[in-house]
Amino acid sequence: MKKEVTVESFELDHTIVKAPYIRLISEEVGPKGDIITNFDIRLIQPNENAMDTAGLHTIEHLLAKLIRQRIDGLIDCSPFGCRTGFHMIMWGKQDSEKIAQVIKSSLEEIAEGITWEDVPGTTIESCGNYKDHSLHSAKEWAKLILSQGISTDAFERKPI
């Protein structure tokens, strides 16, 4: 007999959210009391656009570095298959407003301060698809996202 499961992100009505936003998906408590917090980092409006894979890939590599420079406890920040944002998984209880600030400042650095030499994991030894990167695209997406403002609410625009 198969266990019935609900996948939260498939229950979310993607037609009513207003990207870009940061949304707390869940706080899970492990068997020893450890808390893991999962965020929806939605940068592009679902079903209206999607990031090209090269730009998304470069943003992914940069966020892996930039988030860790700004906040402790990052477990992973991985792109959605739909290419509209990322899952961000953290140790402990985390504040959505703080996460929004971290993402905003990371995107600001991508848009204005990053050079190709700053992008980690771009060699054949360090990346499984090292030829599929575009810093130009990453910068353009970061600028577009920042121009729209990052909201702390998925359903009502409350840009930080």
Curated annotation (Swiss-Prot):
Q: Name one GO molecular function term.
A: S-ribosylhomocysteine lyase activity
Q: Which reaction does it catalyse?
A: S-(5-deoxy-D-ribos-5-yl)-L-homocysteine = (S)-4,5-dihydroxypentane-2,3-dione + L-homocysteine
Q: Could you tell me what the cofactor note in this record states? A: Binds 1 Fe cation per subunit.
Domain of life according to the entry: Bacteria
Annotated residues that bind Fe cation are located at 57, 61, 127
What are the entry keywords?
Answer: Autoinducer synthesis, Iron, Lyase, Metal-binding, Quorum sensing
Cofactor(s) for this protein?
Answer: Fe cation
Enzyme Commission (EC) number: 4.4.1.21
Its BP terms in the Gene Ontology are: quorum sensing
Primary role: Involved in the synthesis of autoinducer 2 (AI-2) which is secreted by bacteria and is used to communicate both the cell density and the metabolic potential of the environment. The regulation of gene expression in response to changes in cell density is called quorum sensing. Catalyzes the transformation of S-ribosylhomocysteine (RHC) to homocysteine (HC) and 4,5-dihydroxy-2,3-pentadione (DPD).
Instruction: Describe the family membership recorded for this protein in Swiss-Prot or TrEMBL.
Output: Belongs to the LuxS family.
Enumerate the HAMAP family for this protein.
LuxS (MF_00091)
Q: How does it assemble?
A: Homodimer.
- The protein's name in its UniProt record: S-ribosylhomocysteine lyase
Gene that this polypeptide is encoded by: luxS
